C-alpha cells in the first residue's frame, strides 16, 4: 500500500494504470535512497495524492493511479487516453526535480526516470521538466518527405544487425537549423524506449509494439549509418522534430512492456534484400 494515500480517484478515470519512479544521481547514475516523491494531478498540482520514498535501488514501489478507459487508446479521435500527473522529487544534497505531465495509460506500468543533480553542481534551483502532449493526441508537424535512398520495392525483413549499434547517440532537441536548441547524449536503448513511448501507446498489442519499435530503430540506425546530419555540417545524430525525424521528449516516462521489448530486439532493424543499411521507413 502507498505510504500516504491522500486523495481519491480522478474524475472520469474509470480504469487504472501503474507507476514506478526510478531516482538516480547525474553523477554515475548512482541510485538515490530515501528520496521523497510527491505525486499530484497535473491540473491540481497543489493537492498531493501520493507520497512515496525510494528504496536502496532508488526505486519507489509500484502504485495504482486512475487512468481513462482502455478503449480510448485503441481508436483514433477518442478523448485523451492517458491521465497526467506531476511528480516532485526531493532528496538531501540534491536539486529538487519537478516533472509535469507524466502519462499514465490503463492496464500498463509507467516507469518514470528521475535524474537528480548534486547541489554542489548547481545553484540550488528546482529543475522543471514539462512533458508535452503525446504525438497521437497533440498537434505536431508532419514528416517532411525525403528522397528514397534505397529504391527497392521488395518488402523489408528483420535481420541480425551488422551495422554497429551505438552505445550513445546525440539528439538535437529541435529542428536542425536551430543552433540554440540543446544537444543531449542519450543511450541508444533509452532513446528508442523514449521515442516508442512518445509515438505509440503502450496499450497496443504486442505485435504492434514490436513492429513500430523495429521501424523506429531502423530510422535511427539509418541516420547513424549514413551520418546523415554530420555530412550536412551538424554535430548531432538525429533531431527530436517530427518534421525531420521522430519525437524524443527529454525526461518523459516510458512503459514496462516497451522497456522489455526494446531490450529484446534492440540489435535488429528492417532491411531490404541487397541493401546494406537499415531502411528509412
Which role fits each region the language model picked out?
Residues 1-2, 26:
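Intrinsically disordered, serine/threonine/proline
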Residues 2-12, 34-38, 53, 59, ...:
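Conserved, single-site charged/polar hotspot
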Residues 8-10, 14-33, 40-44:
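Structural motif
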Residues 14-16, 30-32, 45, 80-82, ...:
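Short, surface-exposed loop/turn motifs at beta-strand boundaries within globular domains
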Residues 44-73:
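Short, acidic Ser/Thr/Gly-rich low-complexity loop/linker segments typical of extracellular
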Residues 70-100:
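A short, solvent-exposed loop/turn motif at the edges and junctions
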Amino acid at each position: 500500500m502507498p505510504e500516504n494515500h491522500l486523495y481519491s480517484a480522478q474524475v472520469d478515470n474509470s480504469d487504472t494504470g501503474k507507476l514506478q519512479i526510478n531516482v538516480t544521481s547525474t553523477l554515475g547514475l548512482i541510485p538515490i535512497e530515501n528520496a521523497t516523491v510527491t505525486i499530484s494531478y497535473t491540473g491540481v498540482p497543489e493537492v498531493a495524492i501520493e507520497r512515496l520514498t525510494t528504496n536502496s535501488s532508488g526505486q519507489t514501489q509500484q502504485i495504482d493511479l486512475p487512468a481513462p478507459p482502455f478503449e480510448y487508446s485503441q481508436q483514433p479521435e477518442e478523448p485523451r487516453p492517458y491521465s497526467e500527473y506531476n511528480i516532485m522529487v526531493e532528496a538531501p544534497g540534491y536539486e529538487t526535480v519537478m516533472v509535469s505531465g507524466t502519462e499514465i495509460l490503463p492496464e500498463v506500468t509507467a516507469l518514470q526516470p528521475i535524474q537528480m543533480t548534486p547541489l554542489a553542481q548547481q545553484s540550488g534551483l528546482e529543475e522543471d521538466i514539462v512533458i508535452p502532449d503525446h504525438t497521437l493526441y497533440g498537434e505536431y508537424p508532419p514528416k517532411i518527405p525525403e528522397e528514397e535512398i534505397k529504391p527497392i520495392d521488395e518488402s523489408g525483413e528483420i535481420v541480425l544487425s551488422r551495422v554497429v549499434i551505438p552505445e550513445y547517440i546525440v539528439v538535437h532537441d529541435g529542428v536542425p537549423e536551430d543552433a540554440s536548441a540543446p544537444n543531449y547524449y542519450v543511450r541508444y536503448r533509452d532513446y528508442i524506449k523514449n521515442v516508442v513511448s512518445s509515438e505509440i501507446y503502450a496499450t497496443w498489442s504486442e505485435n504492434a509494439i514490436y513492429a513500430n519499435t523495429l521501424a523506429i530503430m531502423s530510422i535511427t540506425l539509418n541516420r547513424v549509418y549514413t551520418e546523415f546530419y554530420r555530412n550536412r555540417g551538424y554535430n548531432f545524430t538525429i533531431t527530436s522534430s517530427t518534421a525531420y525525424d521522430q519525437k524524443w521528449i527529454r525526461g518523459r516516462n516510458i512503459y514496462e512492456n516497451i522497456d522489455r521489448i526494446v531490450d529484446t530486439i534492440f540489435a535488429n532493424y528492417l532491411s531490404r534484400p541487397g541493401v546494406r543499411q537499415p531502411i528509412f521507413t
